[in-house]
Amino acid sequence: MFRTMMNGKIHRATVTEANLNYVGSITIDSAILEAVDMLPNEKVQIVNNNNGARIETYIIPGEPGSGVICLNGAAARHVQVGDVVIIMSYGMFTTEEAKTHEPKIVVLDEKNHIEMILPEEKAHTTL
């Protein structure tokens, strides 16, 4: 049996753009992608902390160091510039792999620079 587990998480990203006329996806600063082991075209789930919306799309890498977090196409309808979002990727693991899997988690500051890297997520973690 395979289990779907969180593989990477970008916590408290601030939306910098929402481009309704783009074909689709989310553009993410490629330096952030590297830190959480996310790849171009990888499926991600996005949770908007401001309005509760949850959407799925795929990644387009943005300019490294730019701090860009841009929701494109239909996904742009679910955010406004300045909204705080959580972006998560998932992987499929055997039960044995899942028991030892350690996801990569980064917390961003208000300018989308990596503020901290969390080695794990504990119950009742608040930032």
Curated annotation (Swiss-Prot):
The family database entries (Pfam families) matched by this protein are listed as: Asp_decarbox (PF02261)
Which cofactors does the annotated protein need, by name? pyruvate
Enzymatic class:
lyase
Reaction(s) catalyzed by this protein? L-aspartate + H(+) = beta-alanine + CO2
Q: Name one GO biological process term.
A: pantothenate biosynthetic process
InterPro entries assigned to the protein according to its UniProt record, in alphabetical order: Asp_de-COase-like_dom_sf, Asp_decarbox
Q: What is its EC number?
A: 4.1.1.11
Q: How does it assemble?
A: Heterooctamer of four alpha and four beta subunits.
Q: What is this protein called?
A: Aspartate 1-decarboxylase
